[in-house]
A protein has these predicted regions:
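Acidic, polar low-complexity linker/tail segments
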Residues: 1-44, 53-56
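Composition- and surface-driven signal marking solvent-exposed, interaction-prone regions
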Residues: 2, 58-60, 144-147
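Intrinsically disordered, low-complexity regions enriched in small/polar residues
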Residues: 7, 17-20, 33, 83, ...
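Von Willebrand factor
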Residues: 9-10, 38-94, 116-135, 139, ...
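Intrinsically disordered, low-complexity regions
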Residues: 13, 28, 55, 89, ...
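Von Willebrand factor type A / integrin I
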Residues: 85-87, 98-175
């Protein structure tokens, strides 16, 4: 589900444009549109590190995030660790993504107020193409998002965000 969300929400778009004809054929006086490819620029992954999310879930999340990044190759991934406030902010680029799984250091953050993530993003002018929020869903509210958001809710079938898409995951199914 994570990979599908990222690839459909922010995967690069390929399209053709007549504003720049294909130069390879101009010498033969053949005018065809040139192909333009847009790629994924920025992706935010916000990880709930309140005390109800354990190491097993964090390790599986790290591996899945790395796999997604290998698939869509974003220019930058902004990893935010949060509880009642954002307690960790790590940035990974195409060049540093290979070290992501071993170099990231989750920081614990107490309560679970997801609004701290959107406030932080606004304060730091972080404007991703999409956000993925990994949480147990025991939050005080779902906040308002300025980008598409996917909620990965662990062990809480009752949590139903009123914004974005969501998927429920059982921690015992995470391997």
């Amino acid at each position: 589900m994570l990979r599908e969300f990222v690839t459909t929400t922010c995967a690069g778009n390929d399209y053709s444009t007549w504003s720049r004809p294909n130069r390879r054929l101009l010498g033969q006086e053949i005018y065809l549109p040139s192909g333009i490819s847009e790629k994924v620029e920025d992706l935010v992954v916000a990880v709930d590190t309140s005390y109800s999310v354990g190491n097993r879930e964090l390790n599986v999340a790290k591996t899945e995030i790395k796999s997604i990044c290998d698939t869509v190759e974003p220019d930058m991934v902004r990893l935010l660790y949060w509880g009642s406030r954002v307690v960790g902010d790590e940035t990974y680029t195409v060049d540093t993504m290979n070290s992501f799984v071993t170099s990231t250091r989750p920081k614990c953050g107490g309560g679970t107020e997801v609004e701290c993530v959107t406030d932080y993003m606004q304060e730091k002018a972080i404007k991703p193409q999409a956000a993925i929020v990994i949480t147990d869903g025991y939050v005080s509210g779902w906040s308002k998002w300025d980008c598409p958001v996917l909620w990965v809710i662990i062990d809480n079938k009752g949590a139903k965000p009123n914004v974005g898409k969501y998927v429920h995951v059982r921690s015992e199914d995470m391997r």
